[in-house]
């Protein structure tokens, strides 16, 4: 085992910690859209880390391929989400979700 390889246990602990932090970010701060988007991206990072760890453990390249496609979808999701946030901010002058609960035009 070389010095840069990560054990499966340490990788899973890291991935679980990332996922728990992102869930806590969603639960604690439900009002700010940007925090919610960042927490969702952190969840996807935790899932990607799991794919890479298990792919490395089983010596398969498919985990890296899955991570590539997940990152592409996450980038598109982030771009669309930020565009929606900018449009909402221009229209309402706030991104606080508690003030955006009405469906006015």
From Swiss-Prot:
InterPro entries assigned: NADH_UbQ_OxRdtase_chain4L/K, NUOK/Mnh_C1-like
Subcellular location per the Swiss-Prot or TrEMBL entry: Cell inner membrane
A GO biological-process term: ATP synthesis coupled electron transport
Source organism superkingdom: Bacteria
Primary location recorded for the protein, binned into one broad class: membrane
GO terms under cellular component: NADH dehydrogenase complex; plasma membrane
Keywords: Cell inner membrane, Cell membrane, Membrane, NAD, Quinone, Translocase, Transmembrane, Transmembrane helix, Transport, Ubiquinone
GO function term, MF aspect, one: NADH:ubiquinone reductase (non-electrogenic) activity
Broad class of enzyme this protein falls into: translocase
Membrane topology category: Multi-pass membrane protein
Transmembrane segment boundaries: 8-28, 33-53, 65-85
Pfam families referenced in this protein's UniProt entry, alphabetically: Oxidored_q2
E.C. numbers: 7.1.1.-
Reaction it catalyzes: a quinone + NADH + 5 H(+)(in) = a quinol + NAD(+) + 4 H(+)(out)
Annotated PANTHER family: NADH-UBIQUINONE OXIDOREDUCTASE CHAIN 4L, NADH-UBIQUINONE OXIDOREDUCTASE SUBUNIT ND4L
Its biological purpose: NDH-1 shuttles electrons from NADH, via FMN and iron-sulfur (Fe-S) centers, to quinones in the respiratory chain. The immediate electron acceptor for the enzyme in this species is believed to be ubiquinone. Couples the redox reaction to proton translocation (for every two electrons transferred, four hydrogen ions are translocated across the cytoplasmic membrane), and thus conserves the redox energy in a proton gradient.
Similarity remark: Belongs to the complex I subunit 4L family.
Quaternary context: NDH-1 is composed of 14 different subunits. Subunits NuoA, H, J, K, L, M, N constitute the membrane sector of the complex.
Protein name (Swiss-Prot/TrEMBL): NADH-quinone oxidoreductase subunit K
This protein's encoding gene: nuoK
């Amino acid at each position: 085992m070389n010095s840069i390889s990560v054990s499966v246990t340490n990788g899973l602990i890291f991935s679980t910690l990332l996922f728990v932090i992102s869930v806590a970010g969603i639960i604690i701060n439900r009002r700010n859209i940007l925090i919610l988007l960042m927490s969702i991206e952190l969840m996807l990072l935790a899932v990607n880390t799991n794919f890479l760890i298990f792919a490395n453990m089983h010596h398969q390249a498919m985990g890296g391929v899955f991570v590539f496609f997940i990152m592409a979808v996450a980038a598109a999701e982030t771009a669309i989400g930020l565009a929606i946030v900018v449009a909402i901010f221009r229209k309402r002058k706030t991104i606080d979700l508690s003030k955006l609960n009405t469906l006015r035009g």
